[in-house]
């Protein structure tokens, strides 16, 4: 079935494109949700008239993606994670964790646009993560996973400091 897309769709096409999709996908998803309309003579004429505004909108999206890319290229995320004695993380880092951290920094990035080359990050180190912003425009950010100090280390440090205070000495850390 041929439909005309009303907005950009990843792996399908851009707004105003006429695409061939399976009947069930069109009837059960694209048409009821308002993502597309049937490709008939009337709708084709309407979209031909809107083509100029669609192109302006796409150019504006491309410009916004370039601006966002220049800001994201400077971002470095740090995660402090707990691990077992062998150095394996108790919790891996995935695209949801990265999207949440980016949101805290003021970047509203959809989870599906974040591409972790290794699937999930399960060990300590620095990784390159790609964020797909627009067709042909992507940003690479650095994600660093560091070891979180164990609770025992914190307790022993505070005990040393308290003991030194009682004795009026300086604690060696």
Swiss-Prot record:
PROSITE patterns registered for this protein in UniProt: RIBOSOMAL_L9 (PS00651)
A Gene Ontology molecular function term of the record: structural constituent of ribosome
Residue numbers spanned by region Disordered: 150-173
Cited InterPro entries: Ribosomal_bL9 (IPR000244), Ribosomal_bL9/RNase_H1_N (IPR009027), Ribosomal_bL9_bac/chp (IPR020594), Ribosomal_bL9_C (IPR020069), Ribosomal_bL9_C_sf (IPR036791), Ribosomal_bL9_N (IPR020070), Ribosomal_bL9_N_sf (IPR036935)
PANTHER family tied to this protein: 50S RIBOSOMAL PROTEIN L9
Family: Belongs to the bacterial ribosomal protein bL9 family.
Name of the molecule in the record: Large ribosomal subunit protein bL9
């Amino acid at each position: 079935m041929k439909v005309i897309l009303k907005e950009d769709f990843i792996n399908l096409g851009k707004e105003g494109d006429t695409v061939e999709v399976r009947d069930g996908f069109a009837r059960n998803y694209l048409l009821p949700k308002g993502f597309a309309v049937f490709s008939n003579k009337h709708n084709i004429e309407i979209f031909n008239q809107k083509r100029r505004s669609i192109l302006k909108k796409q150019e504006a999206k491309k410009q916004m993606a370039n601006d966002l890319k220049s800001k994201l290229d400077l971002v470095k995320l740090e995660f402090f994670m707990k691990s077992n004695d062998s150095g394996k993380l108790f919790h891996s880092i995935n695209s949801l964790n990265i999207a949440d951290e980016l949101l805290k920094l003021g970047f509203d990035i959809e989870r599906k646009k974040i591409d972790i080359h290794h699937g999930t990050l399960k060990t300590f180190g620095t990784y390159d993560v790609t964020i797909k912003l627009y067709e042909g425009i992507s940003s690479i950010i650095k994600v660093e996973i560091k070891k979180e100090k164990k609770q025992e280390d914190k307790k022993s440090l505070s005990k040393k400091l308290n003991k030194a205070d009682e004795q009026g000495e300086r604690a060696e850390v």
